[in-house]
Amino acid sequence: LHRDFLYDAKMRGVDWKAARDKYAPLVERVTDRAELNDVLGMMVAEVGALHSQIRPGELRRTEQEGAPAGLGAVLARTNEGYRVEHVYRSEAELPSARAPLSRPEVDVKEGDVITAVNGKDVLGARDISDLLLNQADKQVLLQVKRGNGKGAPRAVIVTPVNMAKQTALRYGDWELSRAEQVAAASQGRIGYLHLRAMGANDIASFARDFYANINREGLIIDVRRNNGGNIDSWIIEKLLRKAWAYWAPPGVQPSSNMQNTFRGHLVVLVDELTYSDGETFAAGIKALKLAPLVGKRTAGAGVWLSDNTRLADNGMARVAENGQFGIDGQWLIEGVGVVPDVEVDNPPHATFNGGDRQLEVALDMLAKKLKEQPRPAFQAQPIPALK
């Protein structure tokens, strides 16, 4: 498959037949599909293409002992029970995406203490997570008492979520904290949006957050940890739109034509986990000189793949097929990543404690830009009287 579909017909200078001969003897020692995946993966790694991945087909799977679930909150064990330290927040416009403990029918506040789950004392268990095993999407009865000590303990019905949703809730809470930091530091002059990936959900996320910030004087687009997809051109097209005129109905703030154009200053955040289409987006921003990039060099996965290379057992040996080069003919991204204009590291200890040096630098850059080049206001000349 790699011989026939890899973006470089010369196999990056690798003798592919010799690579096959090198790993073929290991096939006789393979006992299951997982071991075959290892052999295939080692052989594919010889060509050093990041978008070449092995996906298993049919595997023997052990029966799961228990699927963990969460309440969408940070809990701390105390001598009374589990105190609700923080409930993960979500977009106000997406009520269905709320954390279990933040839903309107659930009367639990930060500081409250959970004392029992389905009638079992939480302090009698190794951890509250043991009592939530296999409870995702099922109604669970909590015994909760107020953190201020007032009132009798009460029963609360809540529906936990699986770990994928728990992780997404935590991620969303982090996104909101970044947006709040930007709004507070800039007195509302600068907006913020984060793109987790470049897929269908991220189209909705971008549309919701970008147009809400369309009239800000500055904007930070954060693609750190972005794991790719295929919407970079769609986003860049929105950023390329320019206002050339303004509609001015009586008593209403003028609006631009082209419609929904962002007229402010822009900064894009990247890091070493910005991957695939997140990198293509960053490369496009840099090539078109739309904004400075701040952060760390990206992962270097610049050759895209397809899912057309399925195997007999429905597994897949994904091949990096679609290389990309710039208008100067130079190959882009693969193996080298996208280098930021301003390199900034996030120190681990400070980051663990809530710091975000990369975001702070982006804010400082925009504040300086707004001072040096303030965005011109909509200002029409007086309408001439009829002669």
Question: Where are the predicted features?
Answer:
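Terminal targeting/pro-maturation regions of precursor/exported proteins
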Residues: 1-53, 77-83, 93, 376, ...
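Cleft-lining beta-strand/loop regions that shape enzyme active-site pockets
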Residues: 2-7, 11, 83, 91-101, ...
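A residue-level signal for conserved active-site and pocket-lining positions in enzyme catalytic cores
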Residues: 43, 193, 330, 362
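PDZ/PDZ-like peptide-tail recognition elements
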Residues: 50-96
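Structural motif
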Residues: 109-113
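Metal-dependent DNA phosphodiester-chemistry modules and their immediately adjacent helices/loops
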Residues: 179-180, 274-276, 312-343
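C-terminal or mid-to-C-terminal helical accessory/interaction module adjacent to the motor/catalytic core
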Residues: 343-350
